[in-house]
Swiss-Prot record:
This is Uncharacterized protein Rv1278. It comes from Mycobacterium tuberculosis (strain ATCC 25618 / H37Rv). One of its GO terms (cellular component) is plasma membrane. PANTHER family: DOUBLE-STRAND BREAK REPAIR RAD50 ATPASE, PUTATIVE-RELATED.
Amino acid sequence: MKLHRLALTNYRGIAHRDVEFPDHGVVVVCGANEIGKSSMVEALDLLLEYKDRSTKKEVKQVKPTNADVGSEVIAEISSGPYRFVYRKRFHKRCETELTVLAPRREQLTGDEAHERVRTMLAETVDTELWHAQRVLQAASTAAVDLSGCDALSRALDLAAGDDAALSGTESLLIERIEAEYARYFTPTGRPTGEWSAAVSRLAAAEAAVADCAAAVAEVDDGVRRHTELTEQVAELSQQLLAHQLRLEAARVAAEKIAAITDDAREAKLIATAAAATSGASTAAHAGRLGLLTEIDTRTAAVVAAEAKARQAADEQATARAEAEACDAALTEATQVLTAVRLRAESARRTLDQLADCEEADRLAARLARIDDIEGDRDRVCAELSAVTLTEELLSRIERAAAAVDRGGAQLASISAAVEFTAAVDIELGVGDQRVSLSAGQSWSVTATGPTEVKVPGVLTARIVPGATALDFQAKYAAAQQELADALAAGEVADLAAARSADLCRRELLSRRDQLTATLAGLCGDEQVDQLRSRLEQLCAGQPAELDLVSTDTATARAELDAVEAARIAAEKDCETRRQIAAGAARRLAETSTRATVLQNAAAAESAELGAAMTRLACERASVGDDELAAKAEADLRVLQTAEQRVIDLADELAATAPDAVAAELAEAADAVELLRERHDEAIRALHEVGVELSVFGTQGRKGKLDAAETEREHAASHHARVGRRARAARLLRSVMARHRDTTRLRYVEPYRAELHRLGRPVFGPSFEVEVDTDLRIRSRTLDDRTVPYECLSGGAKEQLGILARLAGAALVAKEDAVPVLIDDALGFTDPERLAKMGEVFDTIGADGQVIVLTCSPTRYGGVKGAHRIDLDAIQ
């Protein structure tokens, strides 16, 4: 299968795109992110797999959001002997068109065209291989599964050197075996289809036999229950008659007891009324006697209360006099304490003022010392600021002076020395210098540079040194200039002056540091402004009239101690008098309270006595004392007679055993009620069983049981026949599975060898992989280090996934080949391996079609023979 052309119109965000692909080689389709590269693969799948009227989510989601139009996909494909142009429009005005160009021209539309394409692809394309030969963004690192690719299996059979001739129908045979197996079992091995129906039929037949047998047993049980219920009804009728006679006898005895009980209840009511009357008259007589006793008692209590009140009044007067004396003594002690406290406060204030004066003197001396040191430090800092020479400038001057000395020595060592000896008195001119020589006197000059010597009016001699000397002269001049610049920057005349100035600077720095340290020690943790503020506060707090000459700190402290001692003594005396006064006041309050309480009590007793005497006079006016006593005695005799009547009736009632009679009546009634309910229930159950038996007689349950047993025999026979076929299909499938596994073991080695051939240029000569029977890569070995596939980096997984697909593409026969689609892979790969992967692409591209979609075309720059398509240029 080869893809020659793909055109998209109104597909997602793509308005129109038409891309043509070469028949073989590597095609790199590049474009920016979200330009629609992955949409091209998606569009090809929609074209081949879905009808134009499909309403599935995959089709709906590609409709453009900015226009109400249909999405259109056109592809030109060759597969086996066929070459065709296939077009579909989805969503709006749905259309399907097919033009077959080879082997003979055909034109079809609609579902007929769709089915024709699927038929051609089913004949010529290994669908599993077509889907496996893709590296998509969403699963670029997943291990590829090539086990279901028949085209690759045939190729690996040939590569493995299988002696058996391939007929091309192996896959069809396996499919037929799988189809036969699927008639009886699900993929997980559970019964399904005909086998499941046979199992279900047998189970249903056995359940029907069980149900019918249960129904027949139910009829037998109904006959047995009818007999038992008939006997039970007769027995319950006899028991009910006997218990009804027992109930009647119990009722007669209960009625007799009820009559006695009524008489006893009436007697109790009479006795209760007599008791109430007797109680009232007795209570009235007792109340009269109690009132007389109360009057006598209250008279004595009034006399005693008045005596106690008089005594409490005397005690109150005594306590008041004592309290007044204690209060006067407390007032005197308080005045003495106040005077002593004033003296103590004055002495303490005098001592604090003396301490503040001493602290002010110390602070003044300290601040004077600080001011002197700050003045010295400011003078040192001023002298330091006047020194422009720094340590760096000194180092620069020393380096420049050393360079001048070295340059002068080198220049002197290579320069010519010219000596003049005057025969007569003569004057020489050397530059701006005039030299006078007397006869016989000598003078020499070193020619470090071009030098002119003139004898005025006689000659001019020019001495020119060599090139080396000129170079040294230039360096010497530069060194001198550097020295002059450094001296000027340091404002010194020469090196000695610079060193002297540096020594002076160091001494000034040391002096400044000493003064700073001394100043820090004097200030401590406080700032100078704080010290000055404290001094001002101390000075401002001193009174103008304080005589500090006549008083010293020791005298003031002694006076304060004496006054404090007097204050403490006065406080103790005051506290003692306060406690005494408080005790006297407390006693006065207690006696006053007691006197008041006793006076109130005497008044209350007198009032109660008057009230009692008034109440007695009122009662005597109504009933006299003798009449009240006679009535209480008569009511008591009536009560005794009524109580005796109650006792007699209670004895008579006890003799009849009312509890036993009531229990017998209740037991007999319960027994009759229970037997009546059981009798009625038995009659009802007997009727229901009779009705059920009459219904069972019309249902033919025995016949149904015979029919169910016959159906079970037929179902068991059918179950056995289908079971034999199902087991045979399962056995054949397991044999073919073992054969397929054995065959796949032969596939592994040629596939693994092809992987090694393609992978060693990328990973190196030590590259090896382990492949399972499903042709999945399980591990990779480099330099004798084996790493499971799941533990590899994302880049290594991508590279192995691409190599696995390229190996499959290299192995399949030319007529079975499908395009290898790679969607934006190798993003995790370093540049060196990218170049090596490019060589592998070139190798595979020579025989097959490899389509690479990428947003970074530089990744595939190593693919020398690639055909490149820029989507940005064809938008």
